[in-house]
């Protein structure tokens, strides 16, 4: 891949994704196999005005080794130096950039129960720090092809060609062409216009129907609003948290989901694929879950904590989105969630609540924003998906027909 194109992508991440501000610190998190592109992103951050750029390197093989060799108690422990680093982030609010390149199968073979226990133990310590930073800093998740990931997506290609093809797909879906920054300005404007229309309807419930058996009704929080594309921090900095993105999303009301929904794409979770699954909801809670493969893993996901069985997101994405048009299953939620409509189990987004900077976390939980240690997207979009908005004034308005926007 031409370095000029990669530098344009790095600039997009720094200036449109994270929207680095002059004098701001930046923390980049990436795998060890990406030193060249990480250097490009760091350089782009400095050009955008960053005061300091720090890189946190990860290595999936070491993570797998630790899960296998360390005790659950050790894995759950948040060391004093980790707490100090988290407090430093609370105090300084650095911009965060996450570059994904991991092998989708990289954690295969480790105990899902052990991973879940480790995560649960750490979450209780980390959550207060996370809550203090909520909505106060910019962050961006973007992707870089790793060899194992590329071979998973393109198994019949050589390693070099698989990486090249994955680069091409990433750059295409992220609109990295003649003028990517202008393209993203236009894309954000289109998503915002759709959100504005949806927010004007006064939606009480969304009703999903598809020929695969999906029939689900989800309640909306009156104070919630659809968001899409870029978003603002409490301090007013505009950024794009996901590159790419095609969704208009909202956090539904905890306790108000009735019916059944069927997946339309596999869910890659903990190095394994959960395929052809369905989830049935009663009073908002997932009460039944079945899958053709890895049903036990799906049920373990839903039982991760109390909030994991409730919905945290409803996202509207047309079935003919640029990502779906590639015909590629990326085995990566950042991309696959933007291929078609999806729901998410677990944590809701407080920034979908109007006037959220002036509300307490407790108030937003009381409104119905779900809380959980997980947030797992799963795809439900189909070519015939119909979504109807039932509004508080009694109207029923088509939102999706035949898998795409009805307006």
State each model region's role.
Residues 250-306:
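Long, well-ordered mid-to-C-terminal structural blocks that present hydrophobic/aromatic surfaces
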Residues 362-407:
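Extended hydrophobic packing segments that form well-structured cores
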Residues 256-258, 274-276, 283, 309-313, ...:
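Active-site lining segments that contact anionic ligands and/or coordinate catalytic metals
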Residues 11, 199-201, 270-272, 307, ...:
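Short solvent-exposed loop/turn micro-motifs enriched in small/polar/acidic residues
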Residues 14-16, 194-195, 204-206, 248-251, ...:
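Generic recognition of flexible, low-complexity loop/linker segments
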Residues 288-357:
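Dual-mode signal for accessory low-complexity, basic/Gly-rich regions
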Residues 1-258, 389, 395-398, 405-407:
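Active-site bordering "gate/hinge" segments
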């Amino acid at each position: 891949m031409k370095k000029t194109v990669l530098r344009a992508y790095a600039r997009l991440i720094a200036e449109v994704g994270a929207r680095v501000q002059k004098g701001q610190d930046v923390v980049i998190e990436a795998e060890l196999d990406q030193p060249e592109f990480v250097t490009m992103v760091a350089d782009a951050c400095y050009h955008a005005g960053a005061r300091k750029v720090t890189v946190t390197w990860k290595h999936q093989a070491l993570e797998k080794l630790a899960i296998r060799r360390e005790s659950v108690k050790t894995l759950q422990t948040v060391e004093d130096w980790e707490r100090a680093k988290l407090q430093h982030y609370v105090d300084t609010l650095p911009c965060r950039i996450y570059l994904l390149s991991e092998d989708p199968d990289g954690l295969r073979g480790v105990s899902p129960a052990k991973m879940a226990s480790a995560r649960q133990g750490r979450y209780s310590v980390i959550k207060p720090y996370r809550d203090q930073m909520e909505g106060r800093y910019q962050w961006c998740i973007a992707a870089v092809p790793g060899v194992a990931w590329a071979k998973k997506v393109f198994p019949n290609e050589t390693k070099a060609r698989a990486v090249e093809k994955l680069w091409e797909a990433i750059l295409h879906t992220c609109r990295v062409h003649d003028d990517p920054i202008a393209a993203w300005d236009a894309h954000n404007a289109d998503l915002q216009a759709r959100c504005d229309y949806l927010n004007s309807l006064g939606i009480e419930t969304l009703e999903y129907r598809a020929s695969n058996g999906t029939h689900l009704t989800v309640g909306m929080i009156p104070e919630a609003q659809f968001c899409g594309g870029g978003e603002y921090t409490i301090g007013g900095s505009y950024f794009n948290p996901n590159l790419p993105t095609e969704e208009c999303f909202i956090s539904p009301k905890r306790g108000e989901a009735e019916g059944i929904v069927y997946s339309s794409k596999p869910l890659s979770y903990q190095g394994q694929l959960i395929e052809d699954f369905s989830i049935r909801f009663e009073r908002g809670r997932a009460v039944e879950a079945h899958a053709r493969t890895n049903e036990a893993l799906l049920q373990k996901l839903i039982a991760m904590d109390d909030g994991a069985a409730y919905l945290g997101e409803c996202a509207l994405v047309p079935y003919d989105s640029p990502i779906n048009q590639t015909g590629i299953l990326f085995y990566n939620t950042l991309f696959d969630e933007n291929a078609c409509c999806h729901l998410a189990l677990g944590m809701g987004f407080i920034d979908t609540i109007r006037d959220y900077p002036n509300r307490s976390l407790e108030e937003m939980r009381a409104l119905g924003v779900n809380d959980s240690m997980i947030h797992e997207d799963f795809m439900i979009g189909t070519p015939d998906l119909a979504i109807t908005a039932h509004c508080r004034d009694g109207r029923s308005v088509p939102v999706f027909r035949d898998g795409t926007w009805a307006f």
